[in-house]
Every structure is written in C-alpha cells, then in structure tokens.
Design a protein with these regions (language model features):
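Short, Lys/Arg-rich, polar N-terminal cytosolic tail immediately upstream
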Residues: 1-13
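N-terminal signal-anchor transmembrane alpha helix
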Residues: 19-43
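Alpha-helical transmembrane segments of multipass membrane proteins
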Residues: 27, 31, 35, 92, ...
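Structured, non-membrane catalytic/scaffold regions adjacent to prosthetic-group chemistry
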Residues: 45, 90, 94-95, 99-100, ...
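Extracytosolic (periplasmic/ER-lumenal) interhelical loops and adjacent juxtamembrane/interface segments
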Residues: 45-74
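N-terminal secretory signal peptides
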Residues: 105-203
Length: 555
C-alpha cells in the first residue's frame, strides 16, 4: 500500500516537473522572439548584449585571448556566446516554469482548489509571476545600469536607459505570461476531477494547441535569428587590408575595403533624425547637438590612417581614408571647458566608451567626422558621427558617437584597473596608446612569411609596401636583402601626410639563386628609427620589423 502511494506521489511530482519545464521552455522561446523583434525593429538592446558589455571589461586580456584561440577567432567566439546565451535564457525560463508549477501544485494541495473553470490562465498564478517579473527587471537594471545607455538606433543616453529598462520589463513579462499560459494549457483539469487524482492530465486538444504555438514560436525565432545573423558583424568583423588585392595598393582605401573590427553582434543602425550628441561634464555651457547642427558647422578634410592595436607585424588591420568633419576643439570651445579638465570620455550608441587626455582632444587634427572618402559614413564605420584621433590606436577612435564628457582628475572612473576604456580596463595598451612606427611588404604577394611567387635570377622586380609613423609622418624607408646586414634606401612613391601612411617602392635585382631574407624598416618624421625588437600585439600593440623570405630561381 505504501509502495503504491509513494509511486503515485513520484509520478505526480515528475508530472508537475515536466509540465513546468515544457511551459518554461515555450515561454523562454516567446521571450526570445520578443527580444528579437524589439532589437530588429527598434534597436533596443537585448539582455545578452548588455550582459556581454557589462562583463567584458572585467575579463583579463589573457583570458580573452585564450578564449579566442580556443574558439578559433572572434567571430566563432561571438557565435558560441550567442548560442550559450540563448540556451541559458531558455534554461532560466524552464527553471521559472518549474517553480511556477510547483507553486500552483503546492497551493492546490494545501487549499484544495483545482482548475474548476477550465480557464486558460489561473488568476492565482499572478501572486508569483508579477513579483517575479518585477524583481528580475529591477535586479537586471541595477546590475546592468552602466550599459543601459546602449541603443542601436542612437537614442540619447537618458532616453536609452529608459528604453533598455522597458525592453527587459516587456521581455520578462512575456516570459512570465508565457509560463502561466502554457502551464494552463498543459495542466488543465476538469472540475469533476479530485485534487487527489494522481498525475497531471491534459486534454489532447489543449496539449496539441500548446505544442503548435510553441512550434510556431520556434519557427519565428529561427527566422529572426537568421535575419539578425545576415545583418550582423559576422561577415565583416576582422576584415583586413591584406591578401592578393593588396598588390593593387592605393593611397586611399575604398570604404568597403577599409579594415573593420567590432565588439558587437550587430552594429548600430542609427536613425539620424533621432540621434543626438551630448557634450557634458566639467563645462560651463553643456550642449546637445542634432546631426543637422553638426552638418551646418564649418568642416575640414584630412587624410588619416587608422591602425588597430591588434595589428601584427606585416598584417592588414591598417587602412587610410579621407575624413571630413568638425575639429573637436571647435566643438569643445562652445561648451567652455572648466580649468580643472584633464580627460575626455567618449561614449557610443553601442555602449562602447573610451578616454584620452584633454590635450590630445584639443589638437587641431582630432576630428568628429561625418564623411569618409567624400560620402556619409557607412553604418559599419560609425554613421552618423565618429571620432578620428591621429596617432592613437583604433580603439581610441570610437564610432557611433553619442556623448562627450569632460572629466577632472578626481573622477573615480579614471582610476579603474588599467584606466577607463572598454578595452583599456581589460588590460590593452598598458604601455600607452601611441602608435609606434610600422612598415611592411605588400607586393609581390606575401603569403605568411614568404613571397608567394619565386623571383627570377638577374631579373629586376619591384617591391612595394607601406610605412606608417602614427602622427609623426615618415621620412625614410630602407630595404635589406641580406637579413638586415646592409640597407638601401627605398623610394617613397606616395609621401602621404604627417598623420597618414606613406607608400614606398624598391627595385631589386637578385644576384644569387636560393633563399634570401628581405627586411623593411622605416624612420619617422622625427628621425626615430622603427623599433626592431619584436613584441606581440597582445596586450600593448606589436613592434618589430617585417621579415619575408624570397626564393630566387634561375630563369
């Protein structure tokens, strides 16, 4: 007799558990569909993106790089993170479903009530769901507060915080309602059934309805994820200016060939009319600018090269363009900075932030740009407004700019681990943010550490490449064809500007068959020779000379 009772109780418990899990999973899918629609239609950030941005600065650069290596690159790491986050959110919803199912079952047994009205949603479930949704929303708002200014359509930070909080409330509410709805469909009983009846019996019709709705939601989620993937950064993040096309090196890189790096799963798609730029902080005259305000100001054009801190010796994360915009000193003059200002903090629509010294901000070549190569900034390069800071690594040139804040030295944000910046806090650029001098071979085609095609003994070949000295210009480029023992001066065919790269050429006539080690080095505009000591790009940016092997064969 006892065995039968225990067996019945076990089956009843498992049935309650199963109903809760299924209801939670289906509600979790409904929540993800809601998040996807809000992200795609309105640019509202998902909790997944906000959590990533909140946690990222606290990861050590060593852990981040080891994760990249294990994943096989940044894009695979992003995808793994997305899959894990989606599964995690559904799992949490499933746990919520189990708690809800247990809660109702407990009330039934204590108070001896059942689903007498055969209604779709049991009103008594509100006692758990409403507080649960509110508590979850408040907790997420508190934990993610610094990142809530993110808005991928470019809303001002104050409005963005409200929208991000509302997104979580809506999504969590959908999850809570979904748990109640699917639980009711899966566990509904007739009023004639005793509360003591073993197990949880559902009608086939309502069970089918629940699963059909769940299947429709799964199809909708799949469609949303495919759409989001197509517009995501996966196809272009990490695009480098390297490979066979580099043999056609030009001084100005087309916009669609400019190197590209993004922390985002999906880059902002700013709505220009709703976008605003705030300039606040230690100023006497805070300002808010629309794009029309910025576009109406006097502009300058300048040729400037950007180089990523992840640029390795001889790699392609470096490109040159003509930027048009308003000098930052002109904007800052309008807000009247206070005498105690030491640092400028820049924030972007995607939650990115960066700082550098006020003196650098006041240099005439520091630009808030809205055009690139004669056209409006592309979405992937910061439309409608980005920062151009000659001489500093690309991470110091934030895209999708929405706020500029002037700080004094007492501001606590400047005294975080490693400094204040999205990547800076992780440990990048601990030795400084100024770009050291670089040079490389671009043509003939380079494959790894050797030229892709052999050279012909006694036949003159043209070597070409680039040299870049940050904001110091290039005064000389030298080539060695004997592993650095002797050097000859190359011709600088395109001098560029003080803040852009220079292109060089050198004619080499091989005089001996076999393998030769070619090396290039540059001297910057201040007369300083390129650092020859090799240093990996992690975490402080690469240094060292570009060595390439050449195979010389008889004709």
């Amino acid at each position: 007799m006892n065995t039968t009772v225990e067996s019945t109780a076990t089956r009843s418990f498992l049935a309650v558990l199963l109903v809760g899990v299924v209801a939670g999973v289906l509600a979790g899918i409904a929540m993800l569909v809601t998040m996807g629609i809000l992200r795609l239609a309105f640019g509202w950030p998902t909790p997944t993106e906000l959590i990533f941005d909140r946690l990222f600065p606290f990861l050590t650069v060593e852990f981040f790089i080891s994760s990249l290596v294990k994943a096989g690159g940044y894009t695979p790491l992003k995808l793994q993170g997305v899959y894990g986050a989606l599964a995690g959110q559904v799992a949490v919803a499933a746990i919520g479903g189990v708690i809800y199912s247990w809660y109702l079952n407990r009330l039934q047994r204590r108070q001896h009530w059942d689903n007498a009205d055969d209604g779709i949603i049991d009103a008594r479930g509100w006692r758990l769901i409403v507080p649960g949704v509110l508590v979850a929303t408040v907790l997420f708002v508190i934990l993610l507060w610094p990142t809530l200014i993110t808005n991928y359509h470019g809303l001002p930070p104050a409005r963005a915080r409200i929208v991000a909080s509302l997104e979580m409330l809506i999504s969590f509410s959908v999850c809570g309602l979904g748990i109640m709805f699917f639980h009711a469909l899966l566990s509904v009983r007739s009023a004639k059934q005793s509360i003591a009846s073993p197990g949880v019996r559902t009608t086939g019709r309502r069970r089918f309805l629940a699963l059909a709705i769940g299947a429709a939601l799964a199809v909708a989620l799949n469609g949303l994820l495919r759409r989001l993937y197509r517009i995501g950064t996966f196809s272009y993040d990490g695009r480098q200016y390297s490979g066979p096309g580099v043999q056609k090196i030009t001084p100005i890189r087309p916009r669609d060939e400019f190197y590209q790096v993004s922390k985002n799963l999906i880059d902002p798609m700013i709505v220009r009319d709703s976008w605003r730029l705030d300039i606040v902080g230690q100023v006497e005259n805070p300002q808010v600018y629309s794009f029309a305000d910025i576009a109406a100001m006097p502009t300058v054009e300048q040729e400037t090269t950007l180089l990523c801190i992840s640029y390795g010796v001889g790699s392609g994360l470096c490109s040159n363009a003509i930027w048009k915009g308003v000098p930052l000193p002109r904007l800052l003059a309008q807000v009247k900075p206070k005498p105690n200002v030491t640092t400028v903090l820049f924030r972007a629509a995607d939650g990115y932030y960066e700082t550098f010294r006020f003196e650098k901000a006041m240099e005439p070549t520091t630009l808030v740009a809205h055009e690139m190569n004669g056209e409006p900034l592309p979405q992937g390069h910061g439309f409608p407004l980005r920062l151009i800071v000659p001489g500093l690594y690309g991470e110091k040139n934030p895209k999708w700019l929405t706020r500029i804040e002037l700080l004094d030295e007492a501001d606590g944000r400047l005294h975080r681990r490693h400094g204040c910046g999205f990547y800076k806090q992780q440990g990048w650029g601990r030795l400084g943010d100024a770009i050291p001098t670089h040079s490389r071979f671009d043509a003939p085609q380079v494959a790894g550490n050797h030229f892709a095609q052999p050279f012909i003994l006694g036949k003159t070949a043209e070597l070409r490449g680039m040299a870049f000295g940050g904001d110091r210009g290039i005064s000389k480029v030298e080539i060695s064809t004997d592993d650095g023992h002797t050097w000859e001066v190359a011709e600088i065919s395109q001098p560029g500007t003080k803040i852009s790269w220079s292109l060089w050429r050198y004619e080499w006539t091989p005089k001996q068959a076999g393998e030769s080690q070619l090396v290039v080095r540059a001297t910057d505009g201040e007369g300083k020779l390129q650092i020859s000591e090799y240093r990996d790009q992690v975490p402080d940016g690469a240094t060292g000379l570009h060595y390439v092997r050449a195979n010389v064969v008889a004709s």
